[in-house]
Amino acid sequence: MAKIFYGKQSIDKSDIDAAIKCLKSNFLTTGPKVLEFEKEISKTTGCKYSLSCNSGTSAIFLTALMLKLKKGDNIIIPNINFVASFNIFSFLGCNVYLADVDNRTGQATPDSIIECIKKEKIKKLKCFVTMPLGGLLTNIEEFYNIRKKYKCFWMEDNCHALGSDYIFKKKIEKAGSCKHSDFSIFSFHPIKAITTFEGGCINFRDKKHFEKAKLLRSHGIVRKKNYWDYDVILNGFNFRLNDVSAAVGISQIKRLKKFIAKRQNIAKLYFKLLK
């Protein structure tokens, strides 16, 4: 019996050519392609502050480190989601609570988040996470109101949602714009809308958060005038995306609308055949 994969990347000649060109260049990492890719993500999402990472999981971890999440901090996540966010928050010692999801969308709802707060008697909520399953963003105004009411951070796990839109007060906004949330996480794993092999990104509402995460992403290093002269000003890690992956991402994102249309057509076929 033939193995049927639940997802597969779409790679064409332009992606291969972009990778080869980068392999022949002077930079395989920390080069210009990473910055160019981040600019493309910013343009696609309408967010000024985009920071690439070597995976979506690293993007969540980097955000958690930037926020200094610690033992006893209260976090709410949807009970349908990839295990990465639960693993990271648990590893850091946070109290992780699971909000129920709507049986129509498979997503946590504002009511289920508030119900979780009341049921678990959470006095101080540090952060809640939403995940638009299949790229369908819902209840944005209500989630925004929760963020304001409880004075907490709102992280959007938008790994399914690159290229999606949502409506806020009758105005169309882009997924990942961070106009109403604090952080938006993207993944560029092969099954996502575009791929960089492995890769991810964080979009930020606040420039200060962006600058701190940028330091944490690369060993806490601050470069001086001469490239060999630098200081290490905080404990950081290596969560950087490489230039070859970024070059493929730049090529892929040019076909984002085509990729989304293909997925929409497949979804329509499922709805038709599974009536």
What are these regions (language model features)?
Residues M1-L28, P32:
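N-terminal "arm"/small-domain region of PLP-dependent enzymes with the aminotransferase-like
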Residues F27-N74, I88-L92, L98-D100:
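Phosphate-binding glycine-rich loop
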Residues I77, L98, W154-E156:
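Hydrophobic residues in well-ordered beta-strands that form the structural core
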Residues N79, N95-T105:
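Short beta-strand->loop structural element characteristic of the AMP-binding/adenylate-forming
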Residues I80-F86:
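Conserved coil-to-alpha-helix start sites within the AMP-binding
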Residues R104-T196, C201-N203, K207-K208:
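Active-site phosphate-binding strand-loop segment of PLP-dependent enzymes
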Residues H160-I172, H180-K275:
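Active-site region of PLP-dependent enzymes
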